[in-house]
């Protein structure tokens, strides 16, 4: 919501705007930004001299961002309540949008009112394309065999995979391995590929803004730990070069704002879900998929974090 309002104001500076999540008393702006839950609360509680402020005819237009999600069952009251035209926006491929989402907008399933494909946006100069750098590691591809590990890794293996009855599996196949935190050597290899092949700024002296998509919080913290061991010289003056940004943080939005600033650290954000969708940082040059993504819709949302234009960056 914060980013949406910020970008809207930059395009229409003379339009009065309000973010109801942060500005509790500014209800008279011409353009209102809100989460679904905040708006539902305001409909019930906000009043003026004539009674309820947000009547069914209060708005001339209602825009629903991230309309690919299963929003109707949870927030159908909002869509049924306001009688203004409803516009839904999503970056999800049209064949991945759920049927009930099309029904909200009175559309035939799989046929949006208007579609603008990534390839066309790149051709028209509104977005940039992506280039893949595939990195395969032995453990992820083949699994782990206990007898092939070093003594140090055997100790980690025993702590991680020992059964309740004390027995130890001889090997963990690649499919099962993806349910556990990746080992330190694998993380080192992935980080090495990033630091070697990732796009750079400052005349090639510094890795560009990067999002690493981690499997879970423990995995993210492990990646950060290994990064700091491998590249301690990059964090200077108390400013971390890499940082975990997820819902375990107390001030997540502040961390996102710092990452979004080209002149501030961190340069690398290690994220668990929080930066997968909905964040707009044009300076992001590198995306590291350090987890399996089973949803095609989510995958393209994640790809979108790195397709923004940023003239003069490199």
Residue ranges and their predicted role:
Residues 26-28, 44-60, 76, 237, ...:
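Short basic/glycine-enriched coil/helix segment immediately N-terminal to the Walker B
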Residues 37-40, 68-69, 84, 92-96, ...:
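Conserved nucleotide-binding/hydrolysis micro-motifs of P-loop NTPases
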Residues 37-38, 61, 235, 242-314:
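Conserved RecA-like P-loop NTPase helicase motor core
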Residues 99-207:
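Interdomain helical connector at the RecA1-RecA2 junction of SF1/SF2 helicase-like NTPases
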């Amino acid at each position: 919501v914060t980013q949406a309002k910020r970008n809207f104001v930059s395009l229409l500076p003379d339009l009065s705007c309000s973010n109801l999540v942060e500005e509790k008393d500014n209800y008279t702006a011409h353009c209102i930004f809100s989460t679904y839950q905040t708006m539902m609360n305001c409909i019930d509680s906000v009043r003026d001299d004539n009674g309820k402020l947000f009547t069914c005819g209060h708005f001339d237009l209602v825009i629903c961002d991230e309309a690919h999600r299963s929003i109707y069952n949870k927030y159908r009251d909002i869509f049924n309540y306001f009688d203004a035209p409803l516009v839904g926006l999503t970056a999800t491929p049209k064949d991945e949008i759920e049927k009930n989402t099309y029904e909200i907008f009175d559309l035939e399933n799989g046929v949006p009112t208007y579609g603008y494909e990534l390839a066309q946006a790149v051709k028209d100069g509104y977005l940039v394309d992506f280039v893949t750098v595939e990195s395969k590691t032995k453990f992820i591809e083949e699994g782990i065999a206990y007898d092939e590990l070093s003594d140090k890794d055997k100790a980690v293996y025993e702590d991680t995979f020992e059964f309740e009855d004390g027995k130890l599996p001889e090997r963990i196949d690649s499919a099962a391995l993806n349910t556990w935190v990746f080992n330190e050597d694998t993380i080192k290899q992935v980080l090495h590929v990033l630091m070697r092949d990732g796009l750079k700024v400052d005349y090639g002296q510094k890795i560009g803004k990067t999002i690493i998509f981690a499997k879970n919080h423990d995995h993210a913290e492990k990646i950060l730990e290994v990064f700091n061991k491998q590249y301690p010289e990059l964090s200077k003056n108390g400013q971390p070069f890499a940082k975990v940004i997820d819902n375990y943080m107390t001030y997540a939005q502040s961390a996102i704002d710092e990452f979004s600033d080209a002149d501030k650290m961190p340069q690398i954000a290690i994220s668990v879900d929080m930066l997968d969708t909905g964040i707009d940082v044009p300076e992001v040059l590198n995306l590291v998929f350090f987890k399996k993504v089973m949803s095609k819709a989510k995958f393209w949302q994640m790809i979108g974090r790195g397709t923004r234009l940023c003239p003069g960056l490199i």
